[in-house]
From Swiss-Prot:
This is GTP cyclohydrolase FolE2 2. Keywords: Hydrolase. HAMAP family: GTP_cyclohydrol_B. It comes from Burkholderia cenocepacia (strain HI2424). The record marks 166 as: May be catalytically important. GO terms for biological process: tetrahydrofolate biosynthetic process. Gene3D superfamilies: Urate Oxidase. The lineage of its organism: Bacteria, Pseudomonadati, Pseudomonadota, Betaproteobacteria, Burkholderiales. The keyword Lipid metabolism does not apply. It comes from the Bacteria. Belongs to the GTP cyclohydrolase IV family. InterPro entries: GTP_cyclohydrolase_FolE2 (IPR022838), GTP_cyclohydrolase_FolE2/MptA (IPR003801). It is an enzyme of class 3 (hydrolase). The gene is folE2-2. Its EC number is 3.5.4.16.
């Protein structure tokens, strides 16, 4: 085995590299070239979250030189692998890596590089009421870092799952119950509280509003000079704006508290998008919001987008 490896190593010294020696057919510049879906262990430093996460990375550089046949993907891979050295992800670290990628491709006249990281941030979440009860919730995260010349840009996208109850459906349900109550007691001049309580116990849920699991996908620009990513803070702000994030471990008291939260947080998809956008505008740069309610009434979803007033409302 050792002899075979030594022989292969000796042969490698003379291996051809056609990306350097062969001419590019067509002689056209390429906007981006690189790799997608690279498995990578990274460290994310967020309070109350698991530090070690499994990420999927996409990495590319531009190829403006029309005569160059191909880039050096192994160089990109090696530099990307440096993110797995145990240092927590940060804007400065991502910028250094992208700068090194550009520098490694000077022979390709490369001026720009970008990386996208996808992973789940696993956060510990406590129950609404029951003391000592908690569970883990995974939040999908996407980081997009780009270096174009000397300009570095970094955006973070998080997905938050919540419950939404339809205001229109709630109003129709209340109307039905109101009419049923009048049918039962409208002819009586005086009604005993115990009779009302007994009626409510049996009929208060004669009509229920439809609710559904929903998701908010939020994207914000992060400062290039930031020391941390601030992902959990962003997630917390979104959940607080919505008021009804899905729960992990619950007992009956927690489930009841969640029902109360839903009853006090009726929202259309438009309401959800506006709430989240308003909660982020004063704290985060260029927030963009996309919400989706997976309707239980319909076989289709309700969706809404929001962006800063000075920008177009494109998708996250």
């Amino acid at each position: 085995m050792e002899k075979a490896l030594h022989r292969i190593s000796s042969m490698n010294a003379a291996l051809p590299d056609i990306s350097l020696t062969d001419a590019a057919p067509g002689r056209r510049p390429l906007e981006w070239v690189g790799m997608q879906g690279i498995d990578l262990p990274v460290v994310v430093a967020e309070p109350g979250c698991r530090r070690d996460v499994h990420a999927r990375a996409d990495v590319q550089v531009d190829l403006p030189a029309p005569q160059v046949k191909g880039i050096h993907m192994s160089r990109l891979y090696g530099l990307l692998d440096g993110l797995a050295d145990g240092e927590a992800l940060s804007p400065a670290g991502l910028q250094r890596m992208l700068r090194a990628m550009v520098d490694s491709h000077r022979d390709c006249e490369t001026r720009s590089a970008r990386v996208r990281l996808r992973f789940d941030l696993l956060a510990r979440r406590t129950a609404l009421v029951t003391e000592g009860l908690a569970g883990w919730k995974a939040y999908p995260v996407r980081l997009d870092a780009t270096l174009a010349g000397d300009a570095f840009a970094l955006r973070a996208q998080v997905t938050v799952v919540y419950s939404s109850t339809c205001p229109c459906s709630a109003a129709l349900s209340r109307h039905w119950i109101e009419q049923a109550f009048l049918t039962a007691f409208g002819h009586e001049a005086r009604v005993e509280p115990t009779a009302v309580a007994a009626w409510l116990k049996r009929h208060a849920m004669a009509a229920t509003p439809h609710s559904q699991r929903s998701e908010a996908v939020v994207s914000v620009a992060l400062p290039a000079d930031g020391t941390t990513l601030g992902l959990l803070d962003l997630i917390d702000r979104v959940e607080q704006a919505l008021g009804t994030p899905v729960q992990t471990a619950v007992k009956r008291a927690d489930e009841q508290a969640f029902a109360v939260l839903n009853g006090g947080n009726l929202m259309f998809v438009e309401d959800a998008a506006r709430r989240v956008q308003a909660a982020l505008e004063d704290r985060h740069a260029s927030p963009r919001v996309r919400v989706r309610h997976l309707e239980s009434l319909h076989p289709h979803d309700a969706v809404a987008w929001a962006a800063p007033l000075r920008e177009g409302a494109d998708a996250c």
